[in-house]
Structures are given as C-alpha cells and as structure tokens.
Regions:
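Soluble FAD-dependent oxygen oxidases
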Residues: 1, 5-118
Length: 118
C-alpha cells in the first residue's frame, strides 16, 4: 500500500546456513529453525494516516499469521505485542532475567519491552 504520504514495506529476510547450524538452546536467538524473517515497516505523517496504516498492518498480519511461528525478531520491536518476552526470547527469557539480575540489578538498561528483573 502506498500513497503520497503513506507507505508499507513488507520485507522477507532469508535465514538458514550458519544461522541455523548454531544450536538454538545455546543462545537467546529463537529464530534458528526458520528459513526467513518477515519484517513489515509502515510509515505515516499524521494521526489519521497512522490509524489507516495500522489498520492496513493489522489486516496484512492477519492474512500472513497462519504462516508465522509466533516469534518476533528482537531488533524489530512491536509495541503492541501482548507477550513480548515470549515473542522475542521464547524459552530463553528466564535465563536472560537471571543474567539481567546479575549484571543490571538496578535496571539501568530498561525500556518498554526490556528484559524484566526476576
């Protein structure tokens, strides 16, 4: 979907090869058993266009959801995720929380979807 002031850009990033050879249990990267990553960027300039583009994005994601595994690449944050911890880190999240507690007990590094202290 494109317009004078709006744009949607779906991108399919290929995975495989070295990414998939590394054991998934040995890192917090939950995307080791997939062939590709889907990224969808949407752009707008005002609140009305935002509503239009988010509606388009919701419809697009509903269309492709049957082909997705429920995980989201951590470097493409989605503020509307209901369970970002599971989507970004899957079963590695509790271990990441322990690491967070050991190295950042004061929660200096935090944002809306950062790893929470246990």
């Amino acid at each position: 979907m494109t317009g004078v002031q709006t744009c949607a850009l779906p991108i399919l990033e290929p995975y495989g090869g070295a990414i998939n050879r590394y054991p998934m249990a040995d890192s917090a990267f939950v995307h080791r058993n997939v062939d590709a990553d889907l990224v969808v960027d949407v752009f707008w300039r005002n609140p009305a266009e935002r509503a239009q583009m988010e509606a388009w994005l919701d419809g697009f994601m509903q269309l492709v959801r049957p082909f997705l595994n429920g995980h989201v690449y951590q470097n493409y944050p989605d503020a509307r995720l209901a369970d970002f911890a599971s989507a970004y880190w899957g079963p590695a999240y509790p271990q990441l929380q322990r690491i967070k507690a050991a190295y950042d007990p004061g929660n200096f590094f935090h944002f809306q979807q950062s790893i929470r202290l246990p």
